[in-house]
Each structure stands twice: as C-alpha cells, then as structure tokens.
C-alpha cells in the first residue's frame, strides 16, 4: 500500500493547522508535523523578511522526496507544502505532516522529508 500524498509549492500563505489536520487518518495513531518559520536572524545578522523562489522542477522534486516515504506500509498520509515569494518574520515557510500507525514512524518520516 502506498500512502496518500499531497504536496505543493505556493505563493499563498500556508494554513498550517488545516494542512496538518488534513493528514489525519482513522487508521493512524500518530500525526507528526514540522513547521518551518521565518526567523529574525541568520548567521548573526538581522533579518526583516525573506524572499523564496523555486526552480520549475521544484514541485516534482518535492513529490519525489515525499514518495520515498509513501511506500512504507505504516505511513498512510503525507502532506508537504513549501511557500515561495515574500515572507515576513514569523510566517510559515514549510509544513510537513505525516500520519502513521505509530509515533516513532511518523517522526522518522517527517525528519527524512525535511
């Protein structure tokens, strides 16, 4: 069985709560997630905002990365989205959520995808 996957790259703000909630499955005892957030510093320098761009192949590459974990029988759903464009401090840049039968499996998959 291969897990359901939902991936994307968007310039729209990410609704992290909805994306994470969309990973839930009745067959799973765990949903592990990661939210990458724009911080106010990098390398000792202040940051006021960040500009993300993506290569045209980025959606396919993200899907390929996620697919590596989708074939694991204990993973049932993977959601992975990345934001591009102008992001302010505190905005979500990346959301990954994995529904798996057990927490250790979900955490391992999230870590591998990120």
Predicted regions and their residues:
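N-terminal, polar/charged subdomain of small-to-medium soluble alpha/beta proteins
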Residues: 1-94, 99-114
């Amino acid at each position: 069985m291969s897990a359901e996957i939902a991936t994307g790259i968007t310039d729209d703000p990410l609704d992290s709560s909805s994306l994470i909630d969309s990973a839930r499955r009745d067959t799973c005892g765990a949903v592990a997630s990661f939210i990458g957030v724009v911080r106010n510093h990098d390398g000792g320098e202040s940051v006021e905002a960040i500009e993300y761009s993506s290569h045209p192949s980025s959606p396919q590459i993200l899907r390929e990365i996620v697919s590596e974990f989708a074939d694991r029988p204990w993973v049932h759903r993977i959601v992975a989205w990345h934001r591009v464009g102008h992001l302010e401090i505190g905005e979500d840049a990346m959301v990954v959520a994995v529904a798996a039968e057990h927490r250790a499996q979900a955490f391992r998959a999230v870590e591998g995808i990120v």
